[in-house]
From Swiss-Prot:
Subcellular location: Cytoplasm
Keywords linked to the UniProt accession: Aminoacyl-tRNA synthetase, ATP-binding, Cytoplasm, Ligase, Nucleotide-binding, Protein biosynthesis
Pfam families associated with the record: Arg_tRNA_synt_N, DALR_1, tRNA-synt_1d
Motif ('HIGH' region): 122-132
SUPFAM superfamilies found in the cross-reference section: Anticodon-binding domain of a subclass of class I aminoacyl-tRNA synthetases (SSF47323), Arginyl-tRNA synthetase (ArgRS), N-terminal 'additional' domain (SSF55190), Nucleotidylyl transferase (SSF52374)
Enzyme class: ligase
Gene3D superfamilies, sorted: Arginyl tRNA synthetase N-terminal domain (3.30.1360.70), HUPs (3.40.50.620), Isoleucyl-tRNA Synthetase, Domain 1 (1.10.730.10)
SMART domains: Arg_tRNA_synt_N, DALR_1
Name under which the protein is recorded: Arginine--tRNA ligase
Alphabetized InterPro entries for the sequence: aa-tRNA-synth_I_CS (IPR001412), Arg-tRNA-ligase (IPR001278), Arg-tRNA-synth_N (IPR005148), Arg-tRNA-synth_N_sf (IPR036695), ArgRS_core (IPR035684), DALR_anticod-bd (IPR008909), Rossmann-like_a/b/a_fold (IPR014729), tRNAsynth_Ia_anticodon-bd (IPR009080)
Native species: Chlamydia abortus (strain DSM 27085 / S26/3)
């Protein structure tokens, strides 16, 4: 139970006891924004004033009378009727012991679900670019957190490995005798050439469409080339996933191809199809455009595939929740998709599906992050540059480091910096990509969080301790100790709000706050050789474990030295 949920339960019982005419209530409890106002604040007295026809302060006084003061150093009424709660140091000491146990086992939910998270999803025969970065990083982070709290998570890579583009590419490869391609770079060049020819040569276009049919019909030659194209692409994708430490299971669009005719047939049986301009569409009230599920030439599109995927994930994967992580530009598509899936019965209710949309990555001028020639920046090149920038940062700020030490640390710092900069931005917002900012040692950066963790490793080395014990106990005396204890106990709340909103920046904000509290504690409270060394090392152990856990959930790696 979090401190927030504990207070919510106390206030609910107090309100219902003080005012029996109120049948039910979900108390409005928030973390206090200033230490002056205690640890937490109840805001319900003002909200109940109109219903109860009483002054808010009188309501607050009635509520406070119903609450036991055992675990609090103070419960005060402030302003118009805010109830400010400050926990006692004894209660915080005991709560830290419970927190230590929960931290080791994970904050397990009582009713674990099957959660399918669809993220990354690059296209075959094309380089992954900076646009895939956010989907990959955000999706991985959410998957890690859902797993941490006990859910059964299926991470799916909905790779674009089917459609007209493959007929075009296969035809070009056959006719240009380029079947000995070895790299994704080769494929990308050939894809661009094929695309130009497809647009300019009507006969080539017809042959490409014939090859699409051949591929869909299982023609051995077309199939063999398609498999080769996929294998080369996936090998390049996996290289990036290895660098970013991403675990994901491939299930491309082609997987759902056998189910597409059945989807159309089922939608027609349920009278959901309307023929519009010779195409089969599903119209929904409140939307200006329909969801087209079959083109006028009888071909299927990605909406048909997405419907088949939605149905399969519910019926075969037994998903209780389906989360798809793509850019905000696809919001309307997924709104129409959800409406259609609900109407068709592929989704049991509105609580199953969530589209996790995200904003753009921008350059220093606020424009979409691209090369000077206007092309998307290749993700592999971006990651390589991040490592180079991390090397430069270490050489500047850590001149005493050997080349070997820098080479070992730079990949970790580079990937941490990129991930944290992305995840610390509200996912629906655009953000400006800046290596200079993301590799800073101060501010809300991965380097700053890691420095807090490394500082604890330094304490251990100086004391000759290999591992700090989580079996001890706290003895809070100083204000900085109290602030640090409270910060630690708020980690489960950060996890809760991150999962509720599906926004990782709540977790990064928490880690930044915790690291600041730890640095203040380190500044104010002498540890090594202090009469309180044991108790303060216990707080260090909890911070170390919390930072390591939080960084892991973000997909970041730790280092013992920086």
């Amino acid at each position: 139970m979090t401190l927030l949920s504990y207070l919510s339960s106390l206030c609910r019982e107090a309100i219902l006891s003080a005012f029996p005419q109120i049948e039910t209530i979900s108390p409005d409890i928030t973390q206090s924004t200033k230490e002056l106002f205690g640890h937490y604040q109840c805001n319900d007295a003002m909200k109940l004033a109109r219903t109860l026809k009483m002054p808010p302060r009188a309501i607050a006084e009635s509520i406070v009378k119903q609450i036991s003061k055992n675990n609090f150093s103070s419960i005060e009424i402030a302003g118009a009727g805010f109830i400010n709660f400050t926990f006692s140091k004894e209660f915080l000491n005991l709560s830290l012991q419970s927190y230590s146990r929960d931290l080791s086992s994970g904050f397990r939910v009582q009713d674990p679900k099957k959660v399918v998270i669809d993220f990354s999803s690059p296209n075959i025969a094309k380089d992954m670019h900076v646009g895939h970065l956010r989907s990959t990083i955000i999706g991985d982070c959410l998957a890690r957190i859902f797993t941490f709290v006990g859910h059964d998570v299926l991470r799916l890579n909905h790779i674009g490995d089917w459609g007209t583009a493959f007929g075009m590419l296969i035809t070009y490869l056959q006719e240009e005798s380029s079947e000995d391609i070895e790299s994704l770079e080769d494929l990308t060049i050939l894809y661009k050439k094929a695309h130009v020819r497809f647009a300019e040569d009507a006969e080539f276009k017809k042959r490409s469409q014939t090859n699409v049919v051949a591929l869909q019909s299982g023609d051995p030659k077309a199939r063999k080339l398609w498999e080769r194209i996929c294998e080369i692409s996936e090998r390049a994708f996996q290289k990036i996933y290895n660098i970013l430490d991403i675990q994901i299971e491939k299930r491309g669009e082609s997987f759902y191809n056998p189910f597409l005719p059945e989807i159309i047939e089922d939608l027609e049986k349920k009278n959901l199809i309307t023929v519009s301009d010779e195409a089969k569409c599903v119209f929904h009230e409140g939307f200006s455009i329909p969801l087209m599920v079959q083109k006028r030439d009888g071909g299927y599109n990605y909406a048909t595939t997405d419907l088949a995927a939605m149905r399969y994930r519910v019926e075969q994967d037994h998903a209780d929740r389906i989360i798809i992580v793509t850019d905000m530009g696809q919001s309307l598509h997924f709104q129409l998709l959800e409406a259609t899936a609900l109407a068709a019965g592929y989704l049991p209710n509105k609580d199953v599906f969530s589209h996790v949309g995200f904003g753009l990555v921008l350059d220093s001028e606020g424009k979409k992050f691209k090369t000077r020639s206007g092309e998307n920046i290749k993700l592999q090149e971006l990651l390589d540059t991040a490592i180079d920038q991390a090397v430069a940062t270490l050489k500047k700020h850590r001149p005493e480091m050997s080349d070997a030490e820098i080479t070992e640390r730079a990949p970790v710092l580079g990937m941490n910096a990129i991930k944290y900069a992305d995840l610390s931005s509200h996912r629906v917002s655009d953000y400006v990509f800046s290596f200079e900012k993301m590799l800073r040692f101060e501010g809300n950066t991965a380097m700053f969080i890691l420095y807090g963790y490394v500082r604890i490793q330094g304490i251990k080395r100086r004391l000759g301790i290999e591992k700090l014990s989580l079996e001890s106990a706290a003895n809070i005396q100083e204000p900085s100790e109290e602030a640090l204890a409270l910060a630690l106990l708020r980690f489960p709340e950060a996890i809760d709000i991150t999962l509720k909103e599906l926004c990782p920046h709540f977790l990064t904000d928490y880690l930044y706050m915790l690291t600041n509290k730890f640095h203040a504690f380190f500044r104010d409270c002498h540890i090594e050789g202090s009469p309180h060394q044991k108790e303060r090392l216990y707080l260090c152990a909890l911070v170390e474990k919390t930072l390591a856990t939080g960084m892991h959930l973000l997909g970041l790696q730790t280092l013992d030295r920086l």
